[in-house]
Amino acid sequence: MEKFNVHTGVVAPLDRENVDTDAIIPKQFLKSIKRTGFGPNAFDEWRYLDHGEPGQDNSKRPLNPDFVLNQPRYQGASVLLARKNFGCGSSREHAPWALQQYGFRAIVAPSFADIFFNNCYKNGLLPIVLTEQQVDHLFNDTYAFNGYQLTIDLDAQVVRAPDGREYPFEITAFRKYCLLNGFDDIGLTLRHADKIRQFEAERLAKQPWLDNRLVG
């Protein structure tokens, strides 16, 4: 998992409440057995004018010019600004996969659905909760200035705006540690690989029948 320390990026404003996971990545794309390739289909039903299916050449599909991610001023955005209850709906982990593979490193919103919120951390995507008033202010600035950028300093736990304003945010020490070091669940486990191997060797010597094999 990619480490997250300080990130500065263009902000894309998704000015809708209750954006659910089916809007983030529609159900037909969940058939894939891979964890990659979801970025081109993030927000598929809003992003394109036709109906998307797995395996299509998305470069030939007609874009919806009114959708925020298709507007030139927000191209290359890596910070998503959203409204309350972002990521509600079914608990598909494909949703943070799609957002991350689109290019987003962080999402700023007044609130998130719990399961989506947790899935973001597990995949290196930083969900930041600010107050509705703070989010309103950021929406206004994003609309007012082309190429509006935010700097997210995870170590300091603050979002910095170009006008000098700072917006502190909360994160647990464990989640912060994992993101700063690029550890997902597997990475955390592998840090103890030597101890795991030692335990398994000792267990096998004492209880070989559990592995249905003999030690000799």
UniProtKB/Swiss-Prot annotation:
One of its GO terms (biological process) is L-leucine biosynthetic process. Heterodimer of LeuC and LeuD. This is 3-isopropylmalate dehydratase small subunit. It catalyses: (2R,3S)-3-isopropylmalate = (2S)-2-isopropylmalate. Pfam families: Aconitase_C (PF00694). It comes from the Bacteria. CDD domains: IPMI_Swivel (cd01577). It comes from Burkholderia mallei (strain ATCC 23344). Pathway: Amino-acid biosynthesis; L-leucine biosynthesis; L-leucine from 3-methyl-2-oxobutanoate: step 2/4. One of its GO terms (molecular function) is 3-isopropylmalate dehydratase activity. It is an enzyme of class 4 (lyase). Signal peptide: none annotated. Keywords: Amino-acid biosynthesis, Branched-chain amino acid biosynthesis, Leucine biosynthesis, Lyase. Catalyzes the isomerization between 2-isopropylmalate and 3-isopropylmalate, via the formation of 2-isopropylmaleate. The lineage of its organism: Bacteria, Pseudomonadati, Pseudomonadota, Betaproteobacteria, Burkholderiales. One of its GO terms (cellular component) is 3-isopropylmalate dehydratase complex. Belongs to the LeuD family. LeuD type 1 subfamily.
